Amino acid sequence: MNLYKKYQGGLAVWLESSNHKDIGTLYFIFGLWSGMVGTSFSLLIRLELAKPGFFLSNGQLYNSVITAHAILMIFFMVMPTMIGGFGNWLLPLMLGAPDMSFPRLNNLSFWLLPTSMLLILDACFVDMGCGTSWTVYPPLSTMGHPGSSVDLAIFSLHAAGLSSILGGINFMCTTKNLRSSSISLEHMTLFVWTVFVTVFLLVLSLPVLAGAITMLLTDRNLNTSFFDPSTGGNPLIYQHLFWFFGHPEVYILILPAFGIVSQSTLYLTGKKEVFGALGMVYAILSIGLIGCVVWAHHMYTVGMDLDSRAYFSAATMVIAVPTGVKVFSWLATLFGMKMVFNPLLLWVLGFIFLFTLGGLTGVVLSNSSLDIILHDTYYVVSHFHYVLSLGAVFGIFTGVTLWWSFITGYVLDKLMMSAVFILLFIGVNLTFFPLHFAGLHGFPRKYLDYPDVYSVWNIIASYGSIISTAGLFLFIYVLLESFFSYRLVISDYYSNSSPEYCMSNYVFGHSYQSEIYFSTTSLKN
């Protein structure tokens, strides 16, 4: 059935809709658009670093491109797609709910995001741009940027943060209050668990960021001195406040991908539940809890005392335990399955392998003595891109491969989707693996020129980014081709216990008109 057959009411249907499926679709479209813009900025970065010398006119412009790339990818690509897109579409279906708890608030949450995106793009193009990186540290963001660019970036972060807080409250209330009475907490799917913990982290950490950037705004415009040491302030306070948000944000980005991969392993194997399902739930909760108390591992170089560094090193290493539980549970779930050619299997295995590799470099960086040496080098850049570019983004591709036919009623071309995986797998590895070695040799972040000794690693990385971009274009073609070829889903052979598949028609406005009861004997995950 055509997904858009019911959308005959023109633009007003999209602007005013309070239906969770319509809003989820809007989030997907917005996330795809933002991802393309963010990828364009990343390509500019790699073109600048492709060889020694200058491609962009100056370092301020280069740092503005870095800021735009980071904020676009984090706040406008990964979060809207993972939480807004997959969360809106699937959470009510998996809970047996007719819609989200606050449908109009859901609509507001989405429309705050395009506003926020316009503000951050404005910030990059006025007054020489916002060259502060996404961290917006003072005094670079105060005395170093006297123009209006940082003010626009702060308002952008406020709008995006408000969107996420309102959406988070909505998801929490939906999970608590609209869950079918037949679904107890232990019977919720792992995707619902990951979204629930994610939005809890959002509601906990985003007000802290809002406070920090509001103080920064008053420092810039109202002559306060929260972060100005010459008048009794302390810029270190800003770092603590920012990273109290910034580190949970990393888990906000990756946790929904964990849920998607868990659902994908069930789909691939046909098993009733993931291996160690209760252990997986506790691992999700542990990651969320520990992620809130390790923020200062981003700040080893600020001069913390030995006891603080010892604590934050140890606590950071502890996160590897629940993460390891999840990885081995996925592998144990996949164990014994019939190996058939399936692009979904490629994405799942690619995610597990590459996320694990990124996690290993994270264990290296958790050691404060090593991190002081490697801080602000490309080793750190490679680490968090392995976790995000090859973790969260591969999670998004996994989710699209898994649920595309469920959401749209059309089938993706398996061969071309496998080609997308191969291009992206080769491209992102070629981009970020060599940069580990550049970082170990001391190549610093946020510099637009470098000595010739680093040129080999950077040339390889730039070729990799071109391959990745080609993979993205092919992915967009695959999505369009599935519509144009009109390959409809005839029936889904999936006979597992995941609740969303009990829907006979995927495009009704409200899926459940009355309360639905699931059999808890079959609904084990």
Curated annotation (Swiss-Prot):
The cofactor binding remark recorded in the entry reads: Binds 2 heme A groups non-covalently per subunit. Binds a copper B center.
Residues given in the record as O2 binding sites: 251
Show the cross-link location (1'-histidyl-3'-tyrosine (His-Tyr)).
Answer: 247-251
**Positions annotated to bind Cu cation:** 247, 297-298
Record GO biological process: aerobic respiration; mitochondrial electron transport, cytochrome c to oxygen; respiratory electron transport chain
Keyword Magnesium annotated:
yes
Q: Which SUPFAM superfamilies match?
A: Cytochrome c oxidase subunit I-like (SSF81442)
Q: What superkingdom does the record give?
A: Eukaryota
Enzyme nomenclature, EC number: 7.1.1.9
Q: Name the positions where Ca(2+) binds.
A: 48, 53
Q: Which Gene3D superfamilies match?
A: Cytochrome c oxidase-like, subunit I domain
Q: Which residues bind Mg(2+)?
A: 375-376
Cofactor(s) needed, names only, are: heme; Cu cation
Q: Where does Fe(II)-heme a bind?
A: 69, 385
Q: Describe the protein's quaternary organization and the partners it interacts with.
A: Component of the cytochrome c oxidase (complex IV, CIV), a multisubunit enzyme composed of a catalytic core of 3 subunits and several supernumerary subunits. The complex exists as a monomer or a dimer and forms supercomplexes (SCs) in the inner mitochondrial membrane with ubiquinol-cytochrome c oxidoreductase (cytochrome b-c1 complex, complex III, CIII).
Q: What is this protein called?
A: Cytochrome c oxidase subunit 1
Upper lineage:
Eukaryota, Metazoa, Ecdysozoa, Nematoda, Chromadorea
